[in-house]
From Swiss-Prot:
One of its GO terms (cellular component) is SCAR complex. The keyword Iron does not apply. Belongs to the HEM-1/HEM-2 family. The keyword tRNA-binding does not apply. Keywords: Cell adhesion. It comes from Nematostella vectensis. Transmembrane segments: none annotated. Involved in regulation of actin and microtubule organization. Involved in cell adhesion. Part of a Scar/WAVE complex containing brk1, scrA, abiA, pirA and napA. One of its GO terms (biological process) is cell migration. This is Nck-associated protein 1 homolog. InterPro entries: Nck-associated_protein-1.
Length: 1120
């Protein structure tokens, strides 16, 4: 530096600012290079190439002097371009570090030459920038020495460059020498800092009092009430004051790094009185400090190695050993501090939440609290995540703090409160700056009599800028920029801290105190987020993912801490603050890490709440099941009888019966049941989930409640399906009424979550239950609709035909024969089917109906094949049914008549079950949506039948459970069987009715066709034929345009003729003649097209009357 330069031309302030910012960027880049080289996945491929292994060994051995013509380096020839491209970023990062080191050394020399006076209490910003530069330079050179592949990377790149360009890269000689010099970075730096030790020592000595004050124990903090904003109620509105506000929230770890590295680099100063004590005090605080992110510095070991061998430093080495031995005491000190901080910050949060107007006057105390809490958290993290030296009797468990989540939560609460009331702070400090500050500044400036023109301009600009401020700027949303003012103040500190300057800063302490407060106030206007990040940024957890996740899991498992677990996803929003513009390539990896972490935490919280809720629901369902009527007999028996057992002493021991609800009677409030504990855990966890509506993380917004809603939906869906207890192998399923009862009990339990979380459980229920009305849910899993449809169609209806189950119109259910283990009525009575309708809803019942129609279509398809097989005989029967002799002969020629009747019965059974579920659905919907059902009924009755949209109306009515003349679902199912020519179609289906008509008399020869008056049903379900004939005729005629009334009249005529011929048969052969006669009456009664006068015209009513009399006289074995 030329001595002719004036103090303003030296630009010390600007250079310090730029170099500190660039130093952080260089640390970021060298950090990423170190991590990349130590990870096999990201390490440059050239360094692991077997073919280049001899070349790399040669380069490392000869570094930095290498013979480019050496045979070992020939392998690089073919890949020189790839090597230069792959390693250029690494190489030029080291070049930038070398240039940074040179510029920093030049600036430190210039500062020494100018005799700048440093005092943290006088020129805070200048002193801080100076000490930061020293620490940054030291950390950077230590990081360089930790890159294991530095020689191979630099040598390989330079050799490839030389082979390509015919010369060595211009920076390589100096760079190679720097790598050699800084193999032992501390010793080399100590040599270089010999000329600077006077300035460094002066700056560090100004820290002694501050460090002692900030290193007090937690008990001393508590006694001094350093973080209490209500310790003096009379002064609660008085703003927090300090001569140097930034010192109040300056972190101890920062001061500790300054002292350790500063005095160690200038180790000659350690012999000075008072300095050794401060240095030893810093050495006793743990065993490591942070270099950068998760790179730590084991200072006892490193300082010992540095001073070992130096003459006259035996006492200093002894001091290091003594400090290491006393390290265990710091664990208890920090634990006591954290205990105080938890209560103090919680108290502060509660007061500020009630009175946010105190944020302005008490902002300095808030930042102070956040600062020391941040410092304690960082201390704990780095000591928990790095093993203590083996010689010390300390384990990682000694550093673990189970209440860390509480402290993290308190920090996040204060941060969110400051961010929430940002405009309040801006209004307060704008008024402060434009009022008190500018008034006092004018008075202070007037007292300064002699100053240069540059200094005068700077102070005038202060007054002008502050005078132009007003609250209206805040109200209009104007952005403030005070960075120029702060830089001018730093310049002013540099100008007036040089020896011989006029005026000197130390002679104008009023100006210093005022401008320090102005800078502090300005930061709380335009740099609120940056100031918060400075004192409470927890992005360090991004680089300790294992510890971060482990702490979260422990917090989630600890009922006393679970309410604070929301702090962990909130901290993920800090991760992006650690990125640097000097290393943009790390933004995406860190951003992805933050997104995956917040997603993991919120998902785990929601899953834990779901698991607890599932246990609560299970207990509630068990209690609800105790009130079922199926348990009534057992409970009455237990209440009536006294269970007594005799012990060895022949004494009677009474076993007390515990009725349902006994758990609600408490003998003591202190006794907690397992359900109480679960509810308490759920309450705490829900408090965490509902703490915030949204968590912003790297341009994404996460909503914790939505995670809980998603988990509840998944849990509720699985629970509903599991309640059905569908067992495919054993063909079992739970009764619909039981499932519905359990679902309602679970819904009642889940609805209680609204008291804790505000989650819209109605939306959860609607979403899940609506999916359960479909055959598959949104995840592709089977639903209860699919399960019940499969069971009723593939299991139950098959049993109807094979196990002697009968459909009883009188009971409106299917019933069993006596002695059967399976009770069909438990699945088909009115209550069960109404419960099924509630579970499956209109969509699910329609799906069940569609599947039944497909089965009917399958049966009709087989009937069609049988009709075509017997077509000629049926055509003859159709024209000769009134000729007995020919008719009998033709009937004998028919094939598979029993098969036709069996299939008609099957169709009738399916249609009867369809009728039952339609009636159940109609009943349920009339209760749930009476107005809508009345509208549907009115439209069905009054909509014109000739209109083209009539089919749509019928489909709507059928879907609502109402009965239509022609079932549109059946029509749609049978439409696939339609012939191309309608004449052929009409003939085929007409012959089917002829086949059924002539086949009915065959039922009279079977014992199973007997009619049961109690059930109003035939034992073989032959009475269901009436439903199949009417429904199929209506659907087939609707599809092919035929007249169903004509077809049924023809069917009635042929059937009557066939049945009347039974009178000529012998009585002993006709086992159920009267029972079969009743089928004619049933067909007419259920038909919308036929009337009784049509029946009387072809079949004597006297026979029907006698048949009814005859069948009701018989006594049948009762059905269950």
């Amino acid at each position: 530096m030329e001595r002719g330069l004036s103090v303003t031309e030296q630009k010390l302030a600007e250079k310090l600012t730029i170099l500190n910012e660039r130093g952080e960027g260089m640390l970021t880049r060298i950090y990423n290079i170190k991590k990349a080289c130590s990870d096999p996945k990201s390490r440059p491929g050239f360094l692991m190439d077997k073919a280049l292994e001899p070349s790399i060994k040669y380069i490392v051995r000869k570094f930095p002097q290498m013979d480019t013509k050496a045979t070992q380096l020939q392998a690089v020839q073919s890949i020189q371009n790839e090597v230069m491209k792959g390693l250029s970023n690494y190489y030029f990062t080291f070049v930038d570090i070398m240039e940074f080191k040179d510029n920093a050394s030049e600036l430190l020399t210039a500062i020494d030459a100018s005799f700048v006076h440093f005092d943290i209490t006088l020129n805070f910003d200048l002193t801080k920038a100076y000490l930061d530069l020293i620490v940054t330079l030291t950390a950077l050179m230590i990081m360089v020495s930790r890159v294991d592949d530095r020689r191979s990377v630099l040598g390989l790149f330079n050799h490839a460059f030389e082979m390509r360009n015919g010369r060595s890269e211009e920076s390589f000689p100096r760079l190679g020498q720097m790598i050699l010099d800084y193999d032992s970075p501390l010793k080399k730096l100590a040599e270089q800092f010999v000329p600077h030790q006077q300035r460094v020592s002066t700056a560090l000595q100004s820290l002694h009092e501050i460090y002692l004050r900030k290193s007090m124990t937690g008990e001393q903090w508590r006694q001094g009430q350093i973080l209490s904003i209500i310790n003096a109620p009379a002064n609660i509105l008085v703003p927090g004051q300090s001569k140097v506000p930034a010192v109040e929230y300056l972190e101890v770890s920062v001061i500790q790094r300054w002292i350790m590295f500063g005095y160690t680099m200038c180790h000659q100063q350690l012999a000075m009185p008072g300095i050794t004590d401060i240095w030893k005090m810093a050495l006793q605080d743990g065993f490591c400090i942070t270099l950068f992110r998760d790179e730590i510095f084991m200072f006892h070991k490193e300082f010992h190695n540095m001073l070992d061998g130096m003459k006259g430093y035996g006492k200093r080495i002894k001091d290091i050993q003594d400090a290491a031995n006393q390290m265990a005491a710091s664990v208890g000190i920090h634990k006591e501090r954290r205990n105080y901080l938890r209560s103090a910050l919680t108290e502060m949060t509660l007061i500020l939440a009630d009175q946010p107007g105190l944020l302005g006057p008490k902002m300095l105390i808030i930042l102070h609290g956040l600062s020391i809490a941040h410092d304690e958290i960082l201390w704990l993290v780095r000591h928990c995540c790095n093993p203590a030296p083996r010689s010390r009797k300390l384990t990682q468990e000694d550093f673990f703090d189970s209440k860390l989540p509480h402290l993290l939560f308190a920090v996040e609460e204060l941060r969110s409160m400051v961010q929430k009331y940002s405009s309040v702070l801006q209004r307060y400090f704008i008024q402060y700056l434009s009022g008190f500050d500018v008034y006092m500044l004018k008075q202070v400036v007037q007292k300064i009599s002699i100053c240069s023109e540059d200094i005068s301009l700077i102070m005038t600009s202060f007054i002008d800028e502050l005078s132009s401020l007003s609250v209206k700027q805040v109200e209009s949303g104007e952005l403030f920029h005070f960075s120029g003012l702060r830089l001018d103040w730093l310049r002013l500190q540099a100008y007036t801290s040089v020896r011989g300057s006029s005026p000197e800063l130390k002679d104008n302490r009023d100006l210093v105190e005022l401008m320090n407060n102005v800078v502090f106030h300005s930061k709380l206007v335009d740099l609120q987020d940056e100031t918060l990040a400075e004192v409470s940024d927890l992005s360090i957890f991004c680089f300790y993912p294992g510890f971060f996740e482990e702490s979260f899991v422990r917090c989630l498992e600890d009922i006393t801490q679970s309410r604070y677990c929301i702090a962990f996803p909130l901290i993920c929003g800090h991760f992006m603050t650690c990125t640097s513009d000097f290393c943009p390539e790390e933004r995406h990896p860190i951003g992805d890490r933050s997104l995956s972490a917040v997603n993991l935490f919120l998902d785990s919280m929601a899953k834990e709440a779901r698991n607890i809720m599932s246990q609560v629901c299970s207990e509630h369902i068990q209690q609800h099941q105790q009130l079922w009527h199926t348990h009534a007999v057992r409970m009455m028996t237990e209440m009536a009888s006294e269970r007594r057992t005799k012990d060895k002493n022949k004494k009677n021991v009474h076993v007390e019966f515990k009725p349902p609800g006994i758990e609600s009677f408490r003998k003591s409030r202190e006794t907690l049941t397992s359900l109480d504990t679960k509810l308490l855990s759920l309450t705490e966890l829900c408090h965490a989930i509902t703490h915030t509506e949204a968590i912003p993380v790297w341009e994404h917004i996460f909503a914790p409640k939505e995670y809980l809603s998603s988990q509840l939906e998944e849990f509720f869906a699985k629970a509903v399906v599991s309640m059905a207890q569908y067992d495919i192998d054993n063909q079992r399923i739970a009764r619909p009424s039981e499932v519905l009862s359990n679902v309602k009990a679970m819904m009642s339990s889940l609805r209680s979550l609204e008291n804790y979380t505000g989650v819209d459980t109605a939306r959860v229920f609607n979403h899940v239950l609506l999916q359960q009305t479909q055959p598959q849910d949104s995840q592709g899993a089977n639903t209860i609709t699919q399960m019940y449809t499969t069971w009723y169609l593939d299991v139950f209806l098959r049993r109807v035909m094979t196990d002697g189950i009968v459909y009883s119109p009188r009971r409106m259910a299917f019933v069993n024969r006596p002695g059967m283990p399976f009770r069909a009525e438990e699945y088909t009575d009115v209550n069960e089917l109404q419960a099924l309708a509630e579970l499956l809803g209109a969509y699910g019942m329609r799906y069940l109906g569609e599947k039944m129609m497909l089965q009917i279509a399958s049966q009709v398809s087989e009937l069609k094949k049988l009709v075509i097989m017997n077509k000629d005989v049926l055509v003859a029967l159709r024209t000769n049914f009134d000729k007995p002799e020919q008719c009998i002969e033709l009937i004998r020629r028919l094939r598979n008549m029993d098969d036709v009747m069996l299939r008609m019965i099957i169709i009738g059974v399916i249609l009867s079950f369809r009728q039952l579920i339609q009636q159940a659905l109609d009943s349920v919907l009339k209760t749930r949506v009476p107005y809508m059902m009345s509208c549907i009924t009115d439209m069905r009755k009054n909509f014109p039948h000739g209109n083209n949209d009539r089919q749509v109306v019928d489909e709507m009515a059928t879907s609502a459970g109402q009965e239509c003349v022609v079932d549109p679902l059946l029509c749609a199912a049978l439409r696939t069987l339609k012939e191309k020519k309608s004449e052929d179609d009409i003939l085929t289906w007409s012959l089917l009715l002829v086949f059924v008509a002539v086949g009915l008399p065959s039922l009279a020869y079977k014992d199973a066709s007997e009619y049961n008056g109690e059930l109003e049903a035939h034992d073989n379900n032959a009475h269901c034929i009436s439903s199949s004939v009417n429904s199929i005729t209506g659907a087939l005629c609707s599809n092919n345009g035929d007249n169903p009334e004509d077809r049924l009249r023809e069917f009635l005529a042929i059937t009557s003729s066939s049945l009347l011929k039974l009178g000529m048969e012998a009585e002993k052969d006709l086992k159920a003649r009267e029972s079969v006669y009743l089928l004619l009456d049933m067909v007419v009664q259920q038909s919308p097209y036929l009337t009784m006068d049509v029946l009387e015209s072809c079949f004597p009513y006297a026979l029907l009357r006698n048949a009814y009399h005859e069948v009701y006289q018989k006594r049948k074995e009762p059905f269950l």
